[in-house]
């Protein structure tokens, strides 16, 4: 009997994968650790469901694991969400279970540890400082030079991430209710780094046994933070693009520094005006937003299926069959409130090059979400003859896009 522990929230891809696995394979025992609000997603198919208030609480998770192991040992621990990755690494290392360990997970989730290690290894990163309270931000700005980026050391999706342009800007944010999001009330580690002018790329990989099984390198239409709450996206670069080989070498250097051997990686890279490539961040997960579906449309593979197969040491079932052309996606931003109307889907579908329109909300939906890099109304997937056509299509999308609300809920704006 193969025993698997899944640590997850409501992330649908692992749920669908392991539920199907359970239904078709009698020799698998699947236990799940999740929050109580997500338990109904698992209770009808998982063998055991364990409830915790916070999967990031390592003390609680270790104690729970000791109880669970009385039933029998686990062969694999699967942790696919940003909040569960560090916990998964800790539990594997502490209990001697195969898979990515605590140190690798720490470097790929804690941005302060990440950038400190990269700097020690001689891999270029923007100048940064540790910040333990928001009142220390002015000193960080003076030392690094304004503008700076301030964000939690642990987190994803650009949640509670701020570009602060000057001391006056900081004081305005500090004195405004909600101006610094949850940074003021959270007693958690932060990182401040120099905000630089650049182009931004992302490199998405799958590793198994220390080898790269798959790589896709893409360019964002606008740097992520500057594109927040605006139409943005990315497109996959040709392997013949001069920057492709440079980014791939940088990816390999990071993987060696962090001892990445198995699973997915999502690396963000900056190219400065001088042409220097520096590492932004790397995550031990599949890229968010429309990235995985974009890659599926280009290469005819499922990053999720292959990644989850790797997590339980199976054949990744990875046969790459790329289509011709430049494939990418645009994210159309959503806003909090009750959705009255938005651009008819037919207006987007008739644009030349559009492959699919993915709607995340419908008219009449009441939306109350935190602002993040994946807070989207819709995503448009496209295939064009070459990347020179991307900006033209983006301009057409901007002309057609509108979103009208009947009321705004400001708490999470």
From Swiss-Prot:
Its cofactor is Mg(2+); Mn(2+); Co(2+). Residues 115-312 form the ATP-grasp domain. It is an enzyme of class 6 (ligase). ATP binds at residues 141-202. The keyword Ligase applies. PANTHER family: ATP-GRASP ENZYME FSQD, FUMIPYRROLE BIOSYNTHESIS PROTEIN C. This is L-arginine-specific L-amino acid ligase. It comes from Bacillus subtilis.
